């Protein structure tokens, strides 16, 4: 192996930027090219957007179980009537068959994020024994009933986790850091000077990405300049497999940078 490149999408794109900066100091890989695909500007801002999408559930969070069960029942019916294996074609067919309104789609995205974040939050709580969901000091084993913890976790927003678990936990080792300083530290703006100055990092994004707050897409055009390729549509990573987009990604790594 003579050269190393790195890429990542979504949170992985965010991480790739920080890994590249860290490698400037450690010189472990000396990355030749780095491609960020649909990264957030601010992790906190993006998770706040995803958190709020769950508010689109008809009847609110009190109707979470009913909404989720009805959705899975409809999804199962489409699956039974389809000869397609679960994949892009099937998911598109399910989307068309369910005929979801924009609010329902937003709620679905919110539920998907909530289920993923619930697992992360509960696992983190168990590993460090913080006492956020599981009582502090309680030891779980393979036979422990986790139903009650799952019900609690599904009703905890990621921003709640940040303010009530993440920040207090790290506050013990960084006592002088404020909440806003912690939020600022998990943002690409924290390494903006580096991103402006290095020629090895390029970004591929979509103007309508749902994880970006209004105005955040301009950050990429401003900071990366000609190293930014911003498509008008595509949502969050929705056009990664398009032929032109794939060709762009390949060109970044084989053509020495921005096509």
Predicted regions and their residues:
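Alpha/beta-hydrolase-fold enzymes
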Residues: 21-145
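Short beta-strand/loop motif that positions the catalytic acidic residue
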Residues: 197, 202-205
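Alpha/beta-hydrolase active-site loop
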Residues: 1
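Active-site nucleophile elbow and catalytic-triad environment of alpha/beta-hydrolase enzymes
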Residues: 172-193
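Conserved alpha/beta-hydrolase "acid-adjacent" motif
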Residues: 210-216
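Gly/Ala-rich beta-loop-alpha elbow adjacent to hydrolase catalytic centers
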Residues: 8-16
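Catalytic histidine-centered segment of alpha/beta-hydrolase-like enzymes
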Residues: 231-245
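Short beta-strand immediately N-terminal to the catalytic nucleophile in serine-hydrolase-like folds
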Residues: 6-8, 37
